[in-house]
């Protein structure tokens, strides 16, 4: 069911250390492939970059990794876990009780993080494949042509997204060891190149970071931060993957990962100092520091690391969407569980969307340099939203002093605000693609959240106690044939004995549904990820059963599985009579047949509704046409199901005036009378 159930959540193990390599650090671990390259290009290339720019950029990278990744996420954010689960939606569930407006940063951050999921696989795989240009044979055959790079990248992405439906448990077992080799490889090569110029170590002094931002030698100005930020884009994913590996394993493994990453950047900086001023064309410092004998190996290893980073992000996107669905921030989508572990999700619609978006980005931008110009903008938004939610969490924590909360908020809003401002220019250089995608996701979230509020506003309720006698007479009325032994209604609104009025209309008015037992089931999603509990109220009868299911936001909402257990428990306790079942392949079966009734609300005659509310509900109806059916979502595809359409809003017809048209013949006849 997931590593989060391990009792050693706060402890570190050797296996957990390796697992963390493959799951948590894929994104941040591939940043050395393109971060320094982006900085060099922003400074005018190898020919024009200055020593101050190299040392200053390295200092900015070191302190960005320290302040944002280490301090904010590893030291602080990892403590804000929701029953061992991390990420922006888990953080939201911890603080949403304090203020309704917190839904806004949660939706904005979630939408931005999902949109980034399309760009990350494209930029990481492209950056790795571009390393082929460092191989003489490849360079002689294709030169600086980008088409072969694009074709290879598209092929790798196609394979990556196509295998998702089969699960990744087998290949996932090698992710950790491969990433451990990857980190060790570029850490060691960085250390070797560091011996070429130890002067880069002065970058540890934050003076050089500040000096670069103010220096006239900095040709990119404040916008250099847009490239520097690429070094820490994986920090948000680190927090999101908390539930997969545990806090202890992240705390122990991060120092190793950070040292390797910084050594890689130091090695690249040392090489740049030795070769600045030379005309070497478009070079990637990551591959340039390597001897020719290691180029092929490094490209293969970098490609594997890029695939692993992309896989981790794709899996993270599946988890993020499933959480948003259960928090009623996104429509229901079909979710499959292809692996042996419950935590392995596969959402076909999300997989297809990410694949198409990533492929479009590769074709549209062509090179990793162009992608890097658009990369990072969405993550700065997510980090700002996380800072807001995390501040509220810390403010409500009794052990945290208020002065620390103020300092935390002020410091990280300022730092991340600078990164956002520096990255905003990326909007004009392709960032608009990610912004448009994030805006579309946010639009759907806003519509879904608001429509849910309107649904409860217009839904009418009735008291079941007022209709118990009628329902009892109906179940005993011999003039009606038995509809089904058990009739089950799934309802979104049930407060004790008060239920959706449309359900009673379906039972008594449409076509009286005679049954031995009437079930009313409501699913309540809890803030805990793996809750599975229920409450039963039979209203003093043995034929009405009101069931409140309490399921964690990571649990499958498969109603028949839970209902079988509840029926058995009620019969064993004597609260529910045994049901005679003469024909069955199960000897001695004492539970009758079930019919599930799903009521589908349609917006009808909503002219009296405000225009905005009408737009929201009509938009939701259009979105629902391409989402998973309630029957599939609730695991009813192998059960007997009836779907009935009922009006959500119906104007009072008694206020409508209509007059009978009388013909001349009838008028004469009426006068004669």
From Swiss-Prot:
Pfam families: K_trans, K_trans_C. Belongs to the HAK/KUP transporter (TC 2.A.72) family. It catalyses: K(+)(in) + H(+)(in) = K(+)(out) + H(+)(out). Keywords: Cell membrane, Ion transport, Membrane, Potassium, Potassium transport, Symport, Transmembrane, Transmembrane helix, Transport. InterPro entries: K+_transporter (IPR003855), K_trans_C (IPR053952), K_trans_N (IPR053951), Kup (IPR023051). GO terms for molecular function: potassium ion transmembrane transporter activity; symporter activity. This is Probable potassium transport system protein Kup 1. It comes from the Bacteria. Coiled coil: none annotated. Transport of potassium into the cell. Likely operates as a K(+):H(+) symporter. GO terms for cellular component: plasma membrane.
């Amino acid at each position: 069911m997931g590593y989060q159930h391990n009792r050693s959540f706060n402890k570190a193990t050797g296996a957990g250390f390796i697992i963390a390599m493959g799951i948590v650090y894929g994104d941040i671990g591939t940043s050395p492939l393109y971060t320094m390259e982006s900085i060099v290009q922003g400074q005018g290339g190898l020919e024009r970059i200055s020593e101050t720019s190299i040392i200053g950029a390295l200092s900015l990278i070191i302190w960005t990794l320290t302040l944002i990744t280490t301090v904010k996420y590893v030291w602080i954010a990892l403590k804000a876990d929701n029953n061992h689960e991390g990420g922006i939606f888990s953080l939201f569930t911890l603080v949403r009780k304090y203020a309704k407006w917190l839904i806004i940063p949660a939706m904005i951050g979630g939408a931005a993080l999902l949109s980034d999921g399309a760009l990350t696989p494209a930029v990481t795989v492209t950056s790795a494949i571009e390393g082929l240009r460092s191989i003489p044979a490849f360079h002689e055959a294709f030169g600086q042509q980008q088409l072969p790079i694009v074709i290879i990248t598209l092929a790798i992405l196609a394979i990556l997204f196509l295998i998702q439906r089969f699960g990744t448990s087998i290949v996932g077992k090698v992710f950790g060891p491969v990433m451990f080799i990857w980190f060790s490889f570029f850490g060691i090569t960085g250390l070797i190149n560091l011996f070429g110029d130890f002067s880069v170590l002065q970058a540890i002094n934050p003076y050089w970071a500040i000096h670069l931002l103010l220096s006239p030698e900095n040709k990119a100005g404040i916008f250099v931060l847009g490239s520097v930020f690429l070094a820490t884009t994986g920090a948000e994913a680190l927090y999101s993957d908390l539930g997969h590996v545990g806090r202890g394993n992240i705390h122990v493994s991060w120092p190793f990962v950070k040292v390797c990453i910084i050594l890689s950047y130091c090695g690249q900086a040392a090489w740049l100092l030795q070769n600045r001023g030379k005309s070497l064309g478009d070079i990637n410092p990551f591959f340039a520091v390597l001897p020719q004998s290691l180029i092929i190996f490094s490209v293969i290893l970098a490609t594997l690391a890029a695939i692993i980073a992309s896989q981790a992000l794709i899996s993270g996107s599946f988890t993020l969407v499933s959480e948003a669905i259960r928090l009623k921030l996104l429509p229901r989508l079909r979710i499959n569980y292809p692996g042996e572990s419950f935590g392995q999700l596969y959402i076909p619609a999300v997989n297809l969307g990410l694949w198409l978006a990533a492929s479009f980005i590769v074709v549209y931008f062509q090179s990793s340099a162009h992608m890097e110009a658009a990369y990072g903008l969405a993550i700065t938004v997510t980090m700002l939203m996380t800072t807001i939610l995390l501040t509220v969490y810390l403010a409500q924590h009794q052990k945290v002093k208020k002065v620390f909360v103020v300092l935390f908020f002020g410091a990280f809003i300022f730092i991340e605000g600078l990164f956002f401002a520096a990255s905003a220019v990326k909007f004009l250089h392709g960032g608009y693609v990610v912004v448009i995608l994030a805006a579309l996701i946010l639009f759907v979230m806003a519509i879904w959240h608001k429509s849910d509020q309107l649904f409860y506003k217009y839904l009418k309720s009735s008291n079941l106690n007022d209709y118990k006698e009628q329902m009892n007479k109906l179940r005993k009325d011999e003039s009606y044939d038995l509809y089904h032994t058990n009739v089950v209604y799934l309802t979104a609104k049930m407060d004790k004995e008060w239920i959706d009025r449309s359900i009673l209309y379906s039972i008594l008015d449409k076509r009286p549904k005679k049954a031995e037992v009437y079930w009313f089931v409501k699913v309540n999603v809890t803030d805990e990820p793996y809750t599975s509990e229920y409450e039963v109220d039979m209203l003093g009868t043995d034929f009405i059963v009101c069931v409140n299911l309490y399921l964690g936001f990571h649990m499958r909402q498969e109603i028949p599985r839970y209902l079988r257990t509840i029926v058995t428990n009620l019969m064993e306790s004597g609260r529910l009579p045994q049901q005679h079942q003469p024909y069955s392949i199960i000897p001695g079966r004492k539970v009758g047949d079930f019919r599930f009734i799903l009521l589908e609300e349609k917006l009808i005659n909503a002219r009296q509704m405000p225009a905005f509310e009408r737009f929201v509900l009509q938009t939701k109806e259009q979105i629902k046409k391409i989402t998973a059916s309630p029957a599939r979502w609730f695991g009813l595809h192998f059960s007997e199901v009836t779907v009935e359409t009922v009006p959500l809003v119906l104007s009072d017809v008694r206020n409508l005036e209509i007059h009978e048209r009388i013909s001349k013949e009838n008028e004469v006849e009426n006068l004669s009378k």
